[in-house]
Curated annotation (Swiss-Prot):
NAD(+) binds at residues 87-89, 122, 198, 390. This is Glutamate dehydrogenase, mitochondrial. Optimum pH is 8.0. GO terms for cellular component: mitochondrial matrix. It comes from Chaenocephalus aceratus. The lineage of its organism: Eukaryota, Metazoa, Chordata, Craniata, Vertebrata. GTP binds at residues 212, 216, 265, 268. Optimum temperature is 30 degrees Celsius. The keyword NAD applies. InterPro entries: Aminoacid_DH-like_N_sf, Glu/Leu/Phe/Val/Trp_DH, Glu/Leu/Phe/Val/Trp_DH_C, Glu/Leu/Phe/Val/Trp_DH_dimer, Glu_DH, NAD(P)-bd_dom_sf, NAD_bind_Glu_DH. Gene3D superfamilies: 1.10.287.140, Leucine Dehydrogenase, chain A, domain 1, NAD(P)-binding Rossmann-like Domain. Substrate binds at residues 93, 117, 384.
């Protein structure tokens, strides 16, 4: 084994491949059985094994080095990567992270997770991921802009970005600002004649072709995912909790975009956040932490440490007392070293790859339910898909239907009112039909935000049902991750099988 593959620190790409293999071993016979071809059983087996071999590896990995000039006049060489795992559906899709932990292995692993994630939630993209190896705290805004714009040009030169080729998105230490720089650079250089140029990246500000609800999408999806599984009484009896998120306690590791918005939505629907951990310290309050107050404190102070609404927490926040643990930071946080000390009954993977295979086995033995990353944090790519469609359609959701829907709703109310008055109005004059508060809010038709929110909620619910059906069909119990991989493999397999090979 290579140096990085210590028992408790598995190679990240191989870790994802291991999870894939577990899913493939369960579904392989069924795939052979379902093939409607005239081949012999042996040929069918060979075809299935061959396609599974095609799915697994990362198709393209681009490694880049490029110079920038620092504010002090010094020259520096920056390293970056973009991995495209699969082109069974195009474009490829996946975030860009700025972190000192970026490596070829990490980018390949995250790209492969993106392929399976898109398949699980029925978003028609292949998986990709990019990383730039920098610590953003050591660079000025001006320097970060130079790095981002130059990285975009380097990707474009190699054909690794474009609305129909490969569409990046925000990830760790990147957000709307960086996406705006990417879109602007691409649209003003290599794609200055392409009307769809701004669809080259998602997670943009609204003024640059972004979509309402994208910033909170991953956290909102995490909430919907937790809710879908926690409302299922059969699962909750396995882990020993009552159904529903109401009054449950939760702890979050990582108070970035995903952590903050997961906390906000869970709090809004009656769950209680008792602990938050970040790289520089953790806080705990058994009576609950207010998300708004903590968000404001972090904005002002750049840290959660010292927040007056909670006490400092010594030791690992992952091991704190709670019902739901949400790792929303880096990968490989839950390992065989700490898995037995985790008190939560539900682990909701907001981050990508936070659980090692060894920890996964321990959780299954201990009846802890892990809601896997490839389903749970797919809210981000789902709403990115909506944004990409909006860019290709060149019109915001609801723009053409607003007035028509509103008028139709009022006509409906008047029609009911007039019918009632014709029948009963003789005795007492007019019978006003007044919309309820909830209906009044919807009378005007769906805004873009409403459409995004309902589309996301529907996606998370439908995918959860598919995963639950698969888990029950294959008697997987609490092994939700394997059920999700089985679903993803079936869908990707179908595309490869029916497309055939390009040149054989």
């Amino acid at each position: 084994a290579d140096a990085a593959d210590k028992p408790d620190d598995p190679n990240f790409f191989r870790m994802v491949e291991g999870f894939f293999d577990r899913g493939a071993s369960i579904v392989e016979d069924k795939l052979v059985e379902d093939l409607r071809t005239k081949e012999t059983p042996e040929q069918k087996k060979g075809r299935v094994a061959g396609i599974l071999r095609i799915i697994k590896p990362c198709n393209h990995v681009l490694s880049l080095s490029f110079p920038i000039k620092r504010d002090n006049g010094e020259w520096e060489v920056i390293e970056g990567y973009r991995a495209q795992h699969s082109q069974h559906r195009t474009p490829c899709k996946g975030g860009i992270r700025y972190s000192m932990d970026v490596s070829v292995d990490e980018v390949k692993a995250l790209a492969s997770l993106m392929t399976y994630k898109c398949a699980v939630v029925d978003v028609p993209f292949g998986g990709a991921k990019a990383g730039v190896r920098i610590n953003t705290k050591n660079y000025s805004d001006n320097e970060l802009e130079k790095i981002t714009r130059r990285f975009t040009i380097e990707l474009a030169k190699k054909g690794f970005i474009g609305p129909g080729i490969d569409v990046p998105a925000p990830d760790m230490s990147t957000g709307e600002r960086e996406m705006s720089w990417i879109a602007d650079t691409y649209a003003n250089t290599i794609a200055h004649t392409d009307i769809n140029a701004h669809a080259c990246v998602t997670g943009k500000p609204i003024s640059q072709g972004g979509i309402h609800g994208r910033i909170s999408a991953t956290g909102r999806g995490v909430f919907h995912g937790i809710e879908n599984f926690m409302n299922e009484a059969s699962y909750m009896s396995m882990v020993g909790l009552t159904p529903g998120v109401q009054d449950k306690t939760f702890v979050i590791q990582g108070f970035g975009n995903v952590g903050l918005h997961s906390m906000r939505y869970l709090h809004r629907f009656g769950a209680k956040c008792v602990g938050i951990g970040e790289i520089d310290g953790a806080i705990y309050n058994a009576d609950g932490i207010d998300p708004k107050a903590l968000e404001e404190y972090k904005l002002q102070n750049g840290t959660i440490v010292g927040f007056p609404g909670a006490k400092p927490y010594e030791g690992s926040i992952l091991e704190a007392d709670c019902d739901i643990l949400i790792p929303a930071a880096g990968e490989k946080q839950l390992t065989r070293n700490n898995a037995r000390r985790i008190k939560a009954k539900i682990i909701a993977e907001g981050a990508n790859g936070p659980t090692t295979p060894d920890a996964d086995k321990i959780f299954l033995e201990n009846n802890v339910m892990v809601i896997p990353d490839m389903y749970l944090n797919a809210g981000g790519v789902t709403v990115s898909y909506f944004e990409w469609l909006k860019n290709l359609n060149h019109v915001s959701y609801g723009r053409l239907t607003f007035k028509y829907e509103r008028d139709s709703n009022y006509h409906l109310l008047m029609s009911v009112q007039e019918s009632l008055e014709r029948k009963f109005g003789k005795q007492g004059g007019p019978i006003p039909v007044v919309p309820t508060a909830d209906f009044q809010a919807r009378v005007a038709g769906a805004s873009e935000k409403d459409i995004v929110h309902s589309g996301l909620a529907y996606t998370m619910e439908r995918s959860a049902r598919q995963i639950m059906r698969t888990a029950s069909k294959h008697n997987l119990g609490l092994d939700i991750r394997t059920a999700a991989y089985v679903n993803a493999i079936e869908k990707v397999f179908k595309v490869y099988n029916e497309a055939g090979l390009t040149f054989t």
